[in-house]
């Protein structure tokens, strides 16, 4: 045997020997999606390059159903569902008494289902301050969320949120402004959840439009006219009340006052009518 053949045989023995530290076979895991919504289901494939694996499968704390399997068990396809949080999945196979596994982290997202916008106060005069407040229902992952406060088509503020939260979180953005004449426009808030870094897409949700009612301050002459008119109306009202009271008293006296006393005096006997000297 040539030296080259001996050297090649030695490498093969070293490669397949249990103590060589090299992997005798490979395990692969593939997911239909890298990020999923908590309510959806998707497919995961587990496969190996072992020609005749002893056994294999998918380890997961969630619900799973095996859909298909290779006749020799070289690959298996599963339908996974009911994932409520970020989860690590493991594909494992046993080949010639040796076991090997591969893992895959699947992220879970929750879209911005409800976006609410409030104007505080909803009615202002030109030059007064007001606040725009936008609140979004629990979202995950929060670090991929952007809230945009809009006046018409103009963006007033974009707010992002840091930190990698493991559970859905509410988010709020506020913007303080001074009312202008042009502020009688529609205000709105847009929530954007960007899942592209995780193999997903952009999810957008927008609030109902809110209109800020802006009033012009009254001029001095207008205020004077209003005060004069109100004063005249108040004077006429008070005068009419007093006249009604006076005429009512006069009518009452005519009915029960002077004429009543005179009639009673005439009914007295003549002896009692004499006036003392």
From Swiss-Prot:
GO annotations of cellular component type: cell periphery; cleavage furrow; microvillus; plasma membrane; uropod
CDD domains per the UniProt record, alphabetical: IgI_N_ICAM-2
Extracellular side: 23-222
Primary site of residence: membrane
Entry keywords, A to Z: Cell adhesion, Cell projection, Disulfide bond, Glycoprotein, Immunoglobulin domain, Membrane, Repeat, Signal, Transmembrane, Transmembrane helix
Tissues where the protein occurs: Expressed in endothelial cells and leukocytes. High levels found in lung.
Span list, region Required for interaction with EZR, MSN and RDX and co-localization to microvilli: 250-277
Record's subunit section: Interacts with RDX, EZR and MSN.
Family: Belongs to the immunoglobulin superfamily. ICAM family.
Protein name (Swiss-Prot/TrEMBL): Intercellular adhesion molecule 2
Organism: Mus musculus (Mouse)
Classification of source organism: Eukaryota, Metazoa, Chordata, Craniata, Vertebrata
Gene this protein is translated from: Icam2
């Amino acid at each position: 045997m040539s030296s080259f053949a001996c050297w090649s045989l030695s490498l093969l023995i070293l490669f397949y020997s249990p103590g060589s530290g090299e992997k005798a076979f490979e395990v692969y895991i593939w997911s239909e999606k890298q990020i999923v919504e908590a309510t959806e289901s998707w497919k995961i494939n587990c496969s190996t390059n072992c020609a005749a694996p002893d056994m294999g499968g998918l380890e997961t704390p969630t619900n799973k159903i095996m859909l298909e399997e290779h006749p020799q068990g070289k690959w298996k396809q599963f339908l996974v569902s009911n994932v409520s949080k970020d989860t690590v999945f493991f594909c494992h196979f046993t080949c010639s008494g040796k076991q090997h596994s591969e893992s895959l982290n699947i992220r879970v997202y929750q879209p911005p289902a409800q976006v609410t916008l409030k104007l505080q106060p909803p009615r202002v005069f030109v030059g007064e301050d007001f606040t725009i407040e936008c609140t979004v229902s629990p979202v995950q992952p929060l670090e991929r969320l952007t809230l945009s406060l809009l006046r018409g088509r103009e963006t007033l503020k974009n707010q992002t949120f840091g930190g990698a939260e493991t559970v859905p979180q509410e988010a709020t953005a506020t913007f303080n402004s001074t009312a202008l004449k042009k502020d009688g426009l529609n205000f709105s808030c847009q929530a954007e959840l960007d899942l592209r870094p995780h193999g997903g897409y952009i999810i957008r949700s927008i609030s109902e439009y809110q209109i800020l009612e802006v009033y012009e301050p009254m001029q001095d002459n207008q205020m004077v006219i209003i005060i004069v008119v109100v004063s005249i109306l108040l004077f006429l009202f008070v005068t009419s009340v007093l006249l009604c009271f006076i005429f009512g008293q006069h009518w009452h006296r005519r009915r029960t006052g002077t004429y009543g006393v005179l009639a009673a005096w005439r009914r007295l006997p003549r002896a009692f009518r004499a006036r003392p000297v």
